[in-house]
Curated annotation (Swiss-Prot):
The keyword Plastid does not apply. It comes from the Eukaryota. InterPro entries: Cytotoxin_Cobra, Snake_3FTx, Snake_toxin-like_sf, Snake_toxin_con_site, Toxin_cobra-type. Its main location: secreted. The keyword Disulfide bond applies. Disulfide bonds join 3-22, 15-40, 44-55, 56-61. GO terms for molecular function: sodium channel regulator activity; toxin activity. Is classified as a P-type cytotoxin, since a proline residue stands at position 52 (Pro-31 in standard classification). The lineage of its organism: Eukaryota, Metazoa, Chordata, Craniata, Vertebrata. This is Mu-elapitoxin-Na1a. Potent inhibitor of human Nav1.8/SCN10A (IC(50)=141-380 nM). Is highly selective for this channel and acts in a reversible manner. Shows a depolarizing shift of activation and hyperpolarizing shift of inactivation. In contrast to the very similar cytotoxin A5 (AC P62375), does not seem to bind integrin alpha-V/beta-3, since it does not promote or inhibit the proliferation of HUVECs and C-PAE cells. In vivo, in rodent models of inflammatory and neuropathic pain, it alleviates nociceptive behaviors more potently than does morphine. Gene3D superfamilies: CD59. Expressed by the venom gland. Pfam families: Toxin_cobra-type (PF21947).
Amino acid sequence: LKCHNTQLPFIYKTCPEGKNLCFKATLKKFPLKFPFKRGCADNCPKNSALLKYVCCSTDKCN
C-alpha cells in the first residue's frame, strides 16, 4: 500500500507490513479542508476535539 505522508499530494511512501490503511487528518475548525497530517496506520485513528480522521485502503487515496 502506498500512502501520502506529507501535506504535499505528490509525495508518498510504501507502508510497512501490517499497516493496511492510509489516513488523512484535517482540522475540524479550519474552513479549508487542507490535510494536517497523512500517513499509514494499522487502525483508523479516532477523531479528537481538533482533528477529523478519514481512512481508506487503496494506493494514494489519502
